């Protein structure tokens, strides 16, 4: 093999290596951009769902900016702490929106917002992210079914503990035909969120100055 051939082969190898590096870099950039877009879309969906849970006239602050840290995230089904959002009217907490998760969904974790009045009653529940089966488990979405409205007005005592289950398990809440796992997981997660609120009520409803110095 003469010198010219070796130089040509080396040049081609370098070019192939360069193209491979550029390709890997482009894939990484696209992936990073896609992940950022997904995260932003989830934040926007969370913000919309949060405001949907709060009745008009029930707050005069900016709940998205009024956050209280939460602790013991596993009690909310979370891997890491996420803040609670507090709605205030005339300086007093009127409601708390908890971020929770049902880790035992059929196709993975189901991300939830759980709205609770200062008196401990559910304003409502919204699903903000999930991977449940289209046409079956995805009926936990308000856009697909009114099922989630079944939580409205409920509390720890209404129904009693035994009622916090799907009807197939002897509880109060409907399940879906062919998809019991998904609603069962959501019911369990909402019940846990209410327990968390009850155990941490004083801190979650504290005046803004006190909450900010927790």
Curated annotation (Swiss-Prot):
**Membrane topology annotation:** Single-pass membrane protein
Identify the main location.
membrane
Family recorded in the similarity comment: Belongs to the RnfG family.
Q: Where in the cell is it found?
A: Cell inner membrane
- Task of the protein: Part of a membrane-bound complex that couples electron transfer with translocation of ions across the membrane.
Keywords of the record: Cell inner membrane, Cell membrane, Electron transport, Flavoprotein, FMN, Membrane, Phosphoprotein, Translocase, Transmembrane, Transmembrane helix, Transport
What's the cofactor? Answer: FMN
Task: Report the InterPro entries cross-referenced here.
Answer: FMN-bd, Ion_transpt_RnfG/RsxG
Q: Which SMART domains match?
A: FMN_bind (SM00900)
GO CC terms of this entry: oxidoreductase complex; plasma membrane
**Subunit (UniProt):** The complex is composed of six subunits: RnfA, RnfB, RnfC, RnfD, RnfE and RnfG.
A Gene Ontology annotation in the biological process aspect, one of them, is: electron transport chain
Name assigned to this protein? Ion-translocating oxidoreductase complex subunit G
The record's EC number reads 7.-.-.-
Q: Which residue spans traverse the membrane?
A: 13-33
Q: Which GO terms describe its molecular function?
A: electron transfer activity; FMN binding; oxidoreductase activity, acting on NAD(P)H
Which positions carry FMN phosphoryl threonine? 180
What is the gene name? rnfG
Organism (species):
Pseudomonas aeruginosa (strain ATCC 15692 / DSM 22644 / CIP 104116 / JCM 14847 / LMG 12228 / 1C / PRS 101 / PAO1)
Enzyme class (EC, first level): translocase
